[in-house]
Curated annotation (Swiss-Prot):
Function: Endo-1,5-alpha-L-arabinanase involved in degradation of pectin. Its preferred substrate is linear 1,5-alpha-L-arabinan.
Family statement drawn from the similarity comment of this UniProt entry: Belongs to the glycosyl hydrolase 43 family.
Organism encoding this protein: Aspergillus niger (strain ATCC MYA-4892 / CBS 513.88 / FGSC A1513)
EC numbers: 3.2.1.99
Catalytic residue list: D30, E196
Chain positions carrying an annotated carbohydrate: N72, N80, N188, N277
Main localisation: secreted
Keywords for this protein: Carbohydrate metabolism, Glycoprotein, Glycosidase, Hydrolase, Polysaccharide degradation, Secreted, Signal, Xylan degradation
Signal peptide limits: 1-28
Known catalytic reactions: Endohydrolysis of (1->5)-alpha-arabinofuranosidic linkages in (1->5)-arabinans
Pathway: Glycan metabolism; L-arabinan degradation
Protein name: Probable arabinan endo-1,5-alpha-L-arabinosidase C
Superkingdom in the source lineage: Eukaryota
Length: 318
């Protein structure tokens, strides 16, 4: 009986809610979601080609495929300019800025670029190319997975994948990074240093650095050991520019990180996340995941979201 009770307690502690409803075009990879200021329409941007765009009247859908932000690819000269990754879109003074990465799998020959639009619609974007954040085999970081935030009045860009982890650099404006040396925010010392997809979110006097840890794809070829697949993790900081720690006080630079969402039931490898305050469901974390009932290939990935609550100052999937 005692063993049964203990197992039940563990199951309850590790239980996650199923993803929220999604209708229409629900494929997504490294999704980024933003609401248009003029009418509240939701736009979802995803990795692939010139960046996939979908729109919907609500986070639940129905999502409609609109095409690509940059149908002819980017003007950047590093990586694969016709297959752009991990878009991150923000609104500043009447203009939407879409940061994206150009690279190839397993390489540090990478760069981050930016495009602008006033409407968010497909084929309305003007590409400005590289912002000055580029990496190579001689840099400790990989210049992919951009994420923009303003701390106080200063804009910053978070980025990084594997190698020495996640970094942050100050921006001179929305189109270009400063020449300052990027600051290391988080590092995973274990295995092949699987850490990427940073997303920094301010709430309740803290800056929450969410990121994805674990194997992101290739599940149809070989599944990683249980628990080594993608999952969403968090550390927090008072300043947003360093000293990130997890719930147990472990530094994010020392492999720290508290799990927010991991595989469960039919959900496998959730990650590539972001956070948005919705009109009907409050603050939600959104992400892509492989649905075991559909398939484990990248082309089968699904858009997921869950409501977030905060317990003792830490985000919890409701």
């Amino acid at each position: 009986m005692l063993s049964f009770v203990l197992l039940l307690c563990v199951a309850l502690v590790n239980a996650y809610s199923d993803p929220g409803a999604c209708s229409g075009t629900c494929w997504a990879h490294d999704p980024n979601v933003i609401r248009r200021v003029s009418d509240g329409t939701y736009f979802r941007f995803s990795t692939g080609g010139g960046v996939h765009i979908s729109s919907a009247s609500a986070i639940t859908g129905p999502w409609t495929d609109l095409g690509y932000a940059l149908p002819n690819g980017s003007i950047v000269t590093v990586g694969n300019a016709s297959n752009l990754w991990a878009p991150d879109v923000h609104y500043v003074d009447g203009t939407y800025y879409m940061y994206y990465a150009s690279s190839t799998l397993g390489s540090r020959d990478s760069t981050i670029g930016v495009a602008t639009s006033t409407t968010l619609e497909a084929d309305s974007w003007t590409d400005h190319g590289e912002i000055g954040v580029t990496s190579s085999s001689s840099t400790p970081y990989n210049a992919i997975d951009p994420n923009w935030i303003t701390i106080g009045s200063t804009p910053y860009l978070q980025f990084g994948s594997y190698w020495q982890g996640l970094y942050q650099v100050e921006m001179t404006d929305s189109l270009s990074a400063s020449s300052s040396t990027p600051t290391n925010l988080a590092y995973n010392a274990s295995g092949n240093h699987a850490i990427e997809a940073s997303y920094l979110y301010e709430y309740g006097g803290y800056y929450y650095l969410t990121f994805s840890s674990g194997k992101a794809q290739g599940y149809t070829t070989s599944l990683p050991a249980q628990g080594d697949e993608y999952r969403i993790v968090v550390c927090r900081s008072k300043t947003g520019t360093g000293n990130f720690v997890d719930k147990d006080g472990v530094s994010c630079l020392n492999s720290g990180g508290t799990t927010v969402l991991a595989s469960h039931d039919y959900v496998y490898g959730p990650g590539g996340q972001g956070i948005i305050n919705t009109t009907s469901h409050g603050i939600v974390v959104y992400y892509h995941y492989a649905n075991k009932n559909i398939g484990l290939a990248v082309d089968d990935y699904q858009f997921g979201w869950n409501t977030l609550t905060w317990t003792d100052g830490w985000p919890v999937v409701a």
